[in-house]
Swiss-Prot record:
This is Membrane glycoprotein US3. The chain crosses the membrane at residues 161-181. It comes from Human cytomegalovirus (strain Towne). The keyword Electron transport does not apply. The signal sequence is not cleaved. The keyword tRNA processing does not apply. Glycans are attached at residue 60. Keywords: Disulfide bond, Early protein, Glycoprotein, Host endoplasmic reticulum, Host membrane, Host-virus interaction, Immunoglobulin domain, Lectin, Mannose-binding, Membrane, Signal, Transmembrane, Transmembrane helix, Viral immunoevasion. It comes from the Viruses. One of its GO terms (molecular function) is D-mannose binding.
Length: 186
């Protein structure tokens, strides 16, 4: 039982250290094309094979404006409509705020776009975000992380994914064998 406890402690330490190391994919690109609108917050990331996106844009908005969030890849196009409920107006002015969490996407997603338009105008791209990959080390999404690491030629993500998956299998086998051996002698 002591080796299993030591392995569990090492696994927790490894998971915490792996998440604290900055990844080369942690690049956030912000393009501001107008003096009337300003992107104040722009974050996006992958977690458990799903896209999470958070941001805020302020400026000269009216209730006729709306923001659309688009997911762009070579083989996948999707537009998420941020509803009017995210439109706010207070003493600081008008702003849009969005927090999209848990939108399932394939491993081929390259970028997330924010477009702003009025009900009758053409949408214009105001910001873009390259999603960072945040590991979750669950067996549900092992295939997604393997495909993403091979697609991006990210060998660090590939080896980290394989190492953690194999480590979790070893711990599972040790726990199973330890419990069955203990039950046999009771």
């Amino acid at each position: 039982m002591k080796p299993v406890l030591v392995l569990a402690i090492l696994a927790v330490l490894f998971l915490r250290l792996a998440d604290s190391v900055p990844r080369p994919l942690d690049v956030v690109v912000s393009e501001i094309r107008s003096a009337h609108f300003r992107v104040e917050e722009n974050q996006c990331w992958f977690h458990m094979g799903m896209l999470h996106y958070k941001g805020r844009m302020s400026g000269n908005f009216t209730e006729k404006h709306f923001v659309s969030v688009g997911i762009v890849s070579q083989s996948y196009m999707d537009r998420l409509q941020v509803s009017g409920e995210q439109y706010h107006h207070d003493e600081r002015g008008a702003y849009f705020e969005w927090n999209i969490g848990g939108h399932p996407v394939p491993h081929t997603v390259d970028m997330v776009d924010i477009t702003l338009s009025t009900r009758w105008g053409d949408p214009k791209k105001y910001a873009a975000c390259v999603p960072q990959v945040r590991m979750d080390y669950s067996s549900q999404t092992i295939n997604w992380y393997l495909q993403r690491s091979i697609r991006d030629d990210n060998w660090g993500l590939l080896f980290r994914t394989l190492l953690v998956y194999l480590f979790s299998l070893v711990v599972l086998v040790l726990l199973t064998v330890g419990v069955s051996a203990r039950l046999r002698f009771i």
